[in-house]
């Protein structure tokens, strides 16, 4: 068993040839303004109760009006810590931390603290970043993103493993046997590359615990998954998916940006196909602002989630639903 597989939430969220479902947060309105924190907490708790496996947030340090209307972005670690106090089992994920803009020491301490506070529920998506205006603001050489990403990942793994790791790279060095005072429970937190992160698939397979990709044409995703899952050791694959959930459960599929407009029965059949080709987790992003989040969470919870339960719950109900 790998260090990642010892992590309780990793096991609860990911298993070979099985799919689970999560949600993208924060929850927002039609103008992409996030709801009040009390509402975020209530909806997160509801998602936890009905069997969603994860809540994922993005990390964008800066905003520019040139981006247009985008969802409100809070500091991911602070926001997830808040949600952790209002939920019990659901995974708390990042999609994704811009690893190149954060010092590894700060990352190591923040992630360790959140994983311990939440009872080992953190799933750490990591990215190189794609907003070009952020790199000069942080004095980051955009030509060195690949190397910076690699060294950040390696530094985190070392700092989680030992109170006095030996680290001496282009980013920083440690002296006088220094390190974190408190380590993660399993001396590791599951990490997932987002996209290629300017790496090769071979590097990602070797150094990361899984892969977070993007929605793309089904046959393209199928081919990518065949290549990803070709090794003997399981590492999960996941991606977000925008869903404009029609109130008609039988509404047929219509493409939208990053996903589909469809009814719940069509969604269920589509998700079964994603599971069949090897997708292990999908984070749904609800974009229908004519319906309440409560309504959509409850509908998916009643009619779709039972086919894609978190794995601890699947064991308890293994004689129930026939998949």
Predicted feature locations:
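N-terminal beta1-alpha1-beta2 module of alpha/beta enzyme domains
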Residues: 1-86, 189, 287-290, 299, ...
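Hydrophobic faces of well-ordered beta-strands that scaffold small-molecule active sites
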Residues: 21-25, 55-57, 92-94, 122-126, ...
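An alpha-helical appendage that flanks or caps ligand/catalytic pockets
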Residues: 1-17, 143-187, 214-323
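Conserved, mostly hydrophobic/aromatic
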Residues: 59, 83, 114, 124, ...
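Flexible, glycine-rich active-site loops centered on histidine and acidic residues
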Residues: 16-35, 99-168, 290
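Active-site mouth loops of central-metabolism enzymes
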Residues: 25-37, 97-105, 187-196, 251-265
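Catalytic domains of carbohydrate-active enzymes, especially glycoside hydrolases
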Residues: 41-58, 203-214, 273-280
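Short, acidic/polar
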Residues: 34-47, 110, 193-203, 262-274
């Amino acid at each position: 068993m790998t260090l990642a597989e010892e992590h309780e939430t990793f096991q609860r969220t990911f298993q070979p040839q099985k799919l689970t479902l999560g949600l993208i947060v924060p929850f927002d309105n039609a103008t992409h303004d996030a709801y009040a924190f009390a509402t975020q907490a209530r909806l997160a708790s509801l998602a936890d109760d009905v069997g969603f496996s994860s809540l994922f947030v993005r990390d964008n340090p800066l905003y520019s009006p040139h981006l247009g209307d985008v969802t409100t972005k809070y500091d991911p670690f602070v926001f997830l810590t808040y949600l952790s106090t209002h939920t019990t089992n659901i995974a708390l994920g990042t999609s994704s931390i811009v690893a190149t803009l954060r010092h590894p020491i700060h990352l190591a301490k923040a992630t360790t603290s959140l994983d311990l506070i939440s009872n080992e529920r953190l799933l750490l998506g990591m990215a190189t970043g794609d907003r070009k205006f952020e790199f000069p603001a942080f004095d980051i050489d955009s030509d060195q993103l690949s190397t910076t990403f690699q060294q950040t990942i390696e530094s985190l793994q070392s700092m989680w493993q030992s109170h006095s790791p030996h680290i001496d790279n282009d980013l920083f060095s440690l002296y006088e046997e220094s390190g974190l005072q408190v380590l993660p429970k399993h001396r590791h937190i599951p990490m997932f590359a987002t996209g290629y992160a300017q790496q090769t698939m071979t590097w990602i397979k070797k150094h990361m615990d899984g892969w977070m990709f993007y929605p793309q044409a089904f046959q393209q995703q199928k081919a990518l998954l065949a290549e990803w899952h070709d090794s003997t050791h399981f590492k999960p694959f996941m991606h977000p998916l925008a869903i404009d959930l029609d109130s008609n459960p039988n509404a047929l599929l219509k493409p939208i940006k990053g996903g589909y407009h469809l009814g719940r029965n069509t969604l269920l059949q589509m998700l079964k196909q994603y599971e069949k080709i090897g997708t292990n987790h999908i984070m749904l992003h609800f974009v229908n602002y004519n319906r309440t989040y409560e309504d959509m969470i409850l509908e998916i919870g009643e009619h779709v989630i039972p086919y894609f339960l978190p794995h601890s719950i699947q064991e308890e109900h293994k004689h129930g639903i026939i998949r």
